[in-house]
Amino acid sequence: MPRVRIAVGCHPHNAKFYDDGLEADLRRMLKDPRVAALGEIGLDYHYDFSPRDDQREAFRRQLRLAKEAGLPVVLHLREAHDEALAIMREEGFPEAGTLLHCFNLDWATLEPWVEEGCYVAFGGALTFKNADDTREAAARVPADRLLTETDAPYMTPEPMRGMTCLPDHVLFTAE
């Protein structure tokens, strides 16, 4: 499958396992030409499956790796957008780009990220009845920075909600 590309990284849920050995494995994987990005990386303060200090450290180290490798990052952020933005500004945004994965908040949260030139992906949550703020945010993202995604098997869009999300459901989100 020559057109398939992958992203590799240590998700914030697993940040407690990030160590020099894991980083060495990532460095090795980043040399594979099929790797297109480093991700999902970031901060998830909703579940706190890993201690926040571990999440911050893994996030910073992986940002540095992405910049060294000249690769974009795919960010998983939950209840931590302001802190993640501060870290990104301290560490520097990768020249290759930054993608906010599955954004589902409001324009006030998103605007500084867009000002930094980030790409923004919206998943099925964009179609939920209570997502007016997210739809407004999506409408304000420049077209050249706007993406849709499924986050399958999660966040199934209307009208398929309640079922397992599948890749072809991205059409409902895009509409």
What is each of the regions a protein language model found here?
Residues 1-175:
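Mid-domain alpha/beta scaffold segments of enzyme catalytic cores
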